[in-house]
């Protein structure tokens, strides 16, 4: 399926955005918990 240039599947968008959001929240909480939140 090379026809994903103009139409990206919704499940792919949801998976990517969900992973990014969870990753950012995890990094933020981990950084603030370990005392590195102020350096971000």
Swiss-Prot record:
Signal peptide: none annotated. NCBIfam families: PRK02565.1. GO terms for cellular component: chloroplast thylakoid membrane; photosystem II reaction center. Its main location: plastid. It comes from Cycas taitungensis (Prince sago). The keyword Cell inner membrane does not apply. This is Photosystem II reaction center protein J. PSII is composed of 1 copy each of membrane proteins PsbA, PsbB, PsbC, PsbD, PsbE, PsbF, PsbH, PsbI, PsbJ, PsbK, PsbL, PsbM, PsbT, PsbX, PsbY, PsbZ, Psb30/Ycf12, at least 3 peripheral proteins of the oxygen-evolving complex and a large number of cofactors. It forms dimeric complexes. Keywords: Chloroplast, Membrane, Photosynthesis, Photosystem II, Plastid, Reaction center, Thylakoid, Transmembrane, Transmembrane helix. It is a single-pass membrane protein. One of its GO terms (biological process) is photosynthesis. Pfam families: PsbJ.
């Amino acid at each position: 399926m090379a026809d994903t240039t103009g139409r990206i599947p919704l499940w792919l968008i949801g998976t990517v955005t969900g992973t990014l959001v969870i990753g950012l929240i995890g990094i933020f909480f981990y950084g603030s918990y370990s005392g590195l939140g102020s350096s971000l």
